[in-house]
Amino acid sequence: MDIPHEAEAGAWGILPGFGRHHHPSSDATLFSSSLPVFPRGKLQLSDNRDGFSLIDDTAVSRTNKFNESADDFESHSIGNLLPDEEDLLTGMMDDLDLGELPDADDYDLFGSGGGMELDADFRDNLSMSGPPRLSLSSLGGNAIPQFNIPNGAGTVAGEHPYGEHPSRTLFVRNINSNVEDSELTALFEQYGDIRTLYTTCKHRGFVMISYYDIRSARMAMRSLQNKPLRRRKLDIHFSIPKDNPSEKDMNQGTLVVFNLDPSISNDDLHGIFGAHGEIKEIRETPHKRHHKFVEFYDVRGAEAALKALNRCEIAGKRIKVEPSRPGGARRSLMLQLNQDLENDDLHYLPMIGSPMANSPPMQGNWPLNSPVEGSPLQSVLSRSPVFGLSPTRNGHLSGLASALNSQGPSSKLAPIGRGQIGSNGFQQSSHLFQEPKMDNKYTGNLSPSGPLISNGGGIETLSGSEFLWGSPNARSEPSSSSVWSTSSTGNPLFSTRVDRSVPFPHQHQNQSRSHHHFHVGSAPSGVPLEKHFGFVPESSKDALFMNTVGLQGMSGMGLNGGSFSSKMANNGIINSGSMAENGFSSYRMMSSPRFSPMFLSSGLNPGRFASGFDSLYENGRPRRVENNSNQVESRKQFQLDLEKILNGEDSRTTLMIKNIPNKYTSKMLLAAIDEKNQGTYNFLYLPIDFKNKCNVGYAFINMLNPELIIPFYEAFNGKKWEKFNSEKVASLAYARIQGKSALIAHFQNSSLMNEDMRCRPIIFDTPNNPESVEQVVDEESKNMDLLDSQLSDDDGRERS
């Protein structure tokens, strides 16, 4: 039946028929914006944006008429049983507690001043359960204060996602603007020396106080938290800058030490660095023993250690010390890792809200994309007693070294570990090589059956740190190399050679460490491979025999097959004398990113390369490696042997500097050389690629006498370049053309003399050393004596 609206409106002006849906309020109600009517037992607030259910305030004509069903009557009857609005609203307004809600401006200041982060707009996410509560339950250690907004509406985390915590800087809120700076200084200085006191925003209710010692900040926070100052309770938090800290910011008090010898223990480091200040912790980086973090309690100790120990020698290696820069984690992680394992800016990657422990950064399991997955070698390697054992568990690596992913198809690297296989002194070898894109025309048929066997014990492999630092040119370009550090590539392969090495890695390292200074590979490695591999042949004939045997069996034809070897040789890929790097019969198998078939490397023709293995491929075109059994010997003639130089047995003076960053100019190179070797050379030439307007990656320098090569080697070989954030590592070798006169004769009739003066060789006159001065009578050679005008202003030496 028809029921007039006016007659049936409830006490709250709620129309019947709207009982189960929206209840528009009428003007007769107390609150026109009003709350809906619900049964008492089911009163609740929705999770909408403002914490309230939204009510449609559309006016409803009181003259409308409609049919009311039995359900509508029932709803209307229940509505009449509800309490009056005064009883209903009393408890709800108590819960709101609006008088205690914090000022929104305080939260804006707090967020901008102390590096705190709001998960969402604070004012839009307040729940009805009360104001946010600051939890400071355990501020000791690495505990982080956190604002918890009830019902999960939002959190204000006192932890910055890209920094360490707690910090040396305190963010102090609820400051009375009438407090004098001297009063603040006296209050906080009792806990330690204050580095800075920032009071510019004191009138807005907060100040920032920075200590030298992190322990002082912790103690001040514990002692002064909620203590009254001018009738206001102090609200103290650790503060970490939102933006990336600058490279000179030492607030972290943490130093990164590079190029450490693996034999240096944490106790040794503690003794060395502890002389400059009290050390809080020494952390190691997984799989990179040459790379450690030293954290000081006091930043002044870190600054003193940085100045005193940077570029000093420890255990025969020149270390590099830098401040830790946690802000660098904001860069693109995987792209950076794909380019190089050792980006110094990738020290930390914590998640927002997650506590940062004192453990080494970036620990955890990363999926390891196996470089051999899907390749024809997968089944062979999986059954091998050498390759079948991996230092990883379940295909995962922990830490930074394992974070390489598949973005770079030809730079999948995994660190090679060490460990004994059985009891025969074999060293464990993991699969560190790129995915070979193999053609049948190069490989023949690979048999998946049968183990790779060698009875030559004491095979030592490249560890992660040795691969990254001990073999510099392997890092000259991120995708330049992958390594099989075993004595065999056959299936099956039996090596009858007698092992001449020490079968234990530590003994072998001790023996080979003395060779590090005195036997330097020219290319591709600047470090002697007898440190990396377990046995050294007495002659190139030995090495050639081993290499020939090592290639057999890959075609599935057993020891006497030889198909793989012959096919590789016929295609100009393999150098029959090249498998022994620097004359050593440990094998490297490379997979070039620019060339699909595998090739077995070493013994490169020294006159045909520029820098490492990548020189085999220029602009995507393969160079043919000559099949010459004498290449091992010719390789040796370009290696630096410091022992021979000291004994006066080698009088060569012209060197080739390799792996120079392409953006370097002659001026930059001269500046780098003159830091420690000014006046020790009389000729320098940095070849320029005129098309690309950059250098070609190597240079030639002639020293005044052979003895000066030793300090030059110590200053450059195996060191990173400082400019352009380059990851290239310099290496040295003898040049083919020796002596200043021969160099001048080589260049004086070259078309190079018609190019810009900045691209020509530079000759230095050294009147204090008449033996090195050579007069050039050829008219054309006078052009060579013209110097770059830009260099003459910066260089105090006389050049003719």
UniProtKB/Swiss-Prot annotation:
Q: Tell me, what is one Gene Ontology molecular-function annotation carried by this entry?
A: mRNA binding
Instruction: Provide the RRM domain boundaries.
Output: 168-241, 253-326
Q: Which PROSITE patterns match?
A: RRM
- Region annotated Disordered sits at 470-489, 776-800
Any one GO BP annotation for this protein: meiotic cell cycle
* Sequence ranges of Low complexity compositional bias: 471-488
Q: Which SMART domains match?
A: RRM
Q: Which Pfam families match?
A: RRM_1, RRM_2
Could you tell me which CDD domains the record lists for this protein? RRM1_MEI2_like, RRM2_MEI2_like, RRM3_MEI2_like
Q: Which UniProt keywords apply?
A: Meiosis, Phosphoprotein, Repeat, RNA-binding
Gene deletion effect: Early flowering.
List of residues that carry Phosphoserine: 384, 390, 789, 792
Purpose: Probable RNA-binding protein that plays a role in meiosis and vegetative growth.
Name used for this protein in its record = Protein MEI2-like 5
The protein's gene is named ML5
